[in-house]
Each structure stands twice: as structure tokens, then as C-alpha cells.
């Protein structure tokens, strides 16, 4: 059973839950990430937050969403994933992967200043 949580518009019409699932500390195993994301879905959370600095989180999220699509018939399109680059982030990663995999990118103020001053 899905608990209907409130959703709000975010960006260009995406509807996201009021609560976001942060994945910084959920990188122990695929099984743990899968269960956390599955439980989040069933309480109405559809917004996942991650960052390259979270270790294996991005990979585990991707594998978990694929597994949820197969085992629970929960489409990957149900999710809004927010990625971010921290002040000491990898700008090459940002440059090479932003267009491929990211819908929403959060940049800390220090990152914006570095980008404005750099030629990437």
C-alpha cells in the first residue's frame, strides 16, 4: 500500500514529495539501498538526493531502481533524482555527465563561483 504523501511542483513541473531520501549513509550494500528506496516509495517519497562524493550511492541507486522496476513494477520514471556537486567536487565529472544522467543539479555557492572563474 502506498501512503499518499503531499507533493509539490519542483522545477519544470516535476511533482516531488515533501520529504527527500538522502543517500549519503546508505551505501553499505545493494540490498540495503534497495530496501530503503522501496520503503521510501511505499510511504510516498519519490525524491532521491545523491552526490558523486557519496561513494557508491549513485550506482546503488541505479541498480535499485532497475530492480524495483522488475520486482515491484515501479517505473524509474516515478522518481526525481537530485545530484549535487560539493565545493571540492569533480568538475570533469560535472562536465562529462551532467547532460547524460542528471535532471536536477544542486550547486553550492562555492561551486558556482569556481565555475564562473574557470574555463570548463
Where are these regions (language model features)?
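Structural motif corresponding to the early beta-alpha repeats
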Residues: 72-95, 116
Amino acid at each position: 500500500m502506498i501512503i499518499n504523501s503531499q507533493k509539490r511542483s519542483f522545477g519544470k513541473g516535476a511533482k516531488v514529495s515533501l520529504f527527500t531520501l538522502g543517500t549519503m549513509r546508505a551505501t553499505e550494500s545493494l540490498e540495503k539501498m534497495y530496501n530503503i528506496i522501496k520503503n521510501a516509495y511505499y510511504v510516498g517519497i519519490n525524491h532521491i538526493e545523491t552526490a558523486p562524493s557519496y561513494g557508491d550511492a549513485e550506482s546503488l541507486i541505479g541498480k535499485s531502481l532497475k530492480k524495483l522496476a522488475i520486482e515491484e513494477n515501479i517505473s524509474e520514471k516515478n522518481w526525481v533524482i537530485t545530484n549535487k556537486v560539493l565545493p571540492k567536487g569533480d568538475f570533469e565529472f560535472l562536465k562529462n555527465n551532467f547532460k547524460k544522467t542528471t535532471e536536477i543539479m544542486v550547486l553550492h555557492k562555492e561551486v558556482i563561483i569556481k565555475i564562473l572563474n574557470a574555463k570548463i
